[in-house]
């Protein structure tokens, strides 16, 4: 068994996909696809669902991939906080945490915290929490 993909639900899937490509080096895996019909509703347990689905390759990886979905009818929810139960964040390893943070800010993201060392004396690991334009948490790690 292996992890196949991670999915984010977006208010604007094309814009969020562009952010991940620009700021973090993701690349399109396939063309954007519209999913609808009874089979989609049965599959995800939401009758009448209409979804725009975008798949992105993560940097330096063929799998797993990042899926960004936009539902036609989405009531919206506040962005998750660092202590919210459930999926907390996407973490990206980077050789230059400051440069990656600048790229995220330039592409429309925001900074959540400050750079800190979450590692040990033997294995330092600089980390920084950021947010994408829709408020999803991103952790940057530089080991």
Predicted features and spans:
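Short beta-strand/turn micro-motifs at beta-sheet edges
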Residues: 77-79
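Vicinal oxygen chelate
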Residues: 8, 30-31, 64-67, 92-143
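Core segments of cupin and vicinal oxygen chelate
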Residues: 9-62, 99
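Short solvent-exposed loop/turn micro-motifs enriched in small/polar/acidic residues
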Residues: 1, 48-49, 121-123
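Generic beta-structure capping elements
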Residues: 59, 69-73, 143
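Generic short beta-strand segments
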Residues: 32-36, 71-73, 116
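Eukaryotic phosphotyrosine signaling hubs
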Residues: 3, 85-89
